[in-house]
Amino acid sequence: MSKEIIAKKAAIVEEVFEKFQSASSVVVVDYRGLTVEEVTDLRKQLREAGVEMRVIKNTFLKRAADKAGYEGLDDTFSGPTAVAFGGEDITAPARIMAKFAEDHEALEIKGGMIEGKIASLEEINALAKLPNRDGLLSMLLSVLQAPVRNFAYAVKAVADSKDEDAA
């Protein structure tokens, strides 16, 4: 093999390694059986959420994963493999892939990584059920506001009852 080809392959492995390092979450899927239209639709949904999906040779994935410290993923990187690298929203790759897999039986989630740790299929599915960051923040805010709101209603009710008694 020529040195030029080896250098290109090493560059691809390095690029995938950097994506593994920078991604908040990674979801690995088997896309066998999806039409070009369906894959294009999936890529569009992922892109809108700030997630990059790539089809990468399994040997490159294995080498990059080993370099990143994700050992034991050899079973995950077999057959046709696409990888979704998450950005700021840690739940986006899992959520979008799981929803797409519900609608398209051909898409199979194999596993992935969450914040630098290897995740099982169950963990990926649990992550997919969580709302995005904005949804979680709004839930937290409503929980924090509830006691204050209830106290305000109680004070208003007491004030209203005193006004009625005075009248």
Curated annotation (Swiss-Prot):
Give the PROSITE patterns listed for this entry. Answer: RIBOSOMAL_L10 (PS01109)
Q: Is the Ribonucleoprotein keyword given for this protein?
A: yes
From which lineage does this chain's organism come? Answer: Bacteria, Bacillati, Bacillota, Bacilli, Lactobacillales
What is the protein's name according to its record? Large ribosomal subunit protein uL10
Ranges annotated as spanning the membrane: none
Q: Does the keyword Amino-acid biosynthesis apply?
A: no
- The highest taxon in the source lineage is Bacteria
Gene Ontology annotations of biological process type: translation
Q: Which InterPro entries match?
A: Ribosomal_uL10 (IPR001790), Ribosomal_uL10-like_sf (IPR043141), Ribosomal_uL10_bac (IPR022973), Ribosomal_uL10_bac_type (IPR047865), Ribosomal_uL10_CS_bac (IPR002363)
